[in-house]
Amino acid sequence: MKINTALILCAGFGERLNPLTLKTPKPLLKLKDITVLESCINIIVKLGVKKIFLNTFYLSEQIFDFIKNKNFPVDIKIIQDGDEILDTGGGIKNMTNHFQDNDFLIFNPDTLWNTEYVEEINRMQDFYFLNKLTNVL
C-alpha cells in the first residue's frame, strides 16, 4: 500500500530567515535555480502521491501564483489558513478537513529534499502499513 495524499506546510512567516522572507515566503526561496517548495513537490511526485494539500497564510498570493504558473504532474489544492496563523497543528487540522484519507504524509518545504529520501520514505510507509501504526515520525 502507498499513501496517496501529502500535506505541505507553507503558512509560516519564516522569521528566522529575515530579511530574505520580508517580501518572499520561505517556501519560495531559491537554492540554485529551484525553490525549496518545488524541491518538496518533486520528491512527493517521485513517491507517487496523487494529491497535495498545501496551506498558506503569509504572502499567500505569491504561493498561489507560483503553483498556478507551474505545471506540476500532481493535483495540488491550496488551503488558506484563515484570518490568523494556525501554527503547525492547526494548519494540519485545517487541511485534514478538506479530504477523506486517513493516511497522509506531511512535509515542511524548508527541508532540503532530494531523491535520496524517496527510498527512506517508502520504507517508512511500508513499516507504517505492515505494523498498522497510528503515525510514524
Regions found by a protein language model. Name each.
Residues G12, K26, D110:
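Conserved G/P- and acidic residue-centered "switch" motifs that form tight phosphate/ATP-binding loops
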Residues G14-R16, N131:
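Glycine-rich "HGGG/HGxG" loop immediately N-terminal to the catalytic nucleophile
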Residues T24-P27, K46, N102, R123:
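Alpha-helix termini
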Residues K23-E38:
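Short catalytic helix/loop segments, enriched in acidic residues and glycine
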Residues L28, I78, N135-L137:
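Conserved beta-strand scaffold positions in the cores of enzyme catalytic domains, especially
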Residues M1-I8, R16, I34-N108, N114:
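Conserved N-terminal catalytic core of the sugar/cofactor nucleotidyltransferase
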Residues T115-L137:
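Conserved donor-nucleotide/metal-binding helix-loop-beta segment in metal-dependent transferases, i.e.
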Residues P19-L20:
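Short acidic/histidine- and often glycine-rich active-site loop of Leloir-type glycosyltransferases
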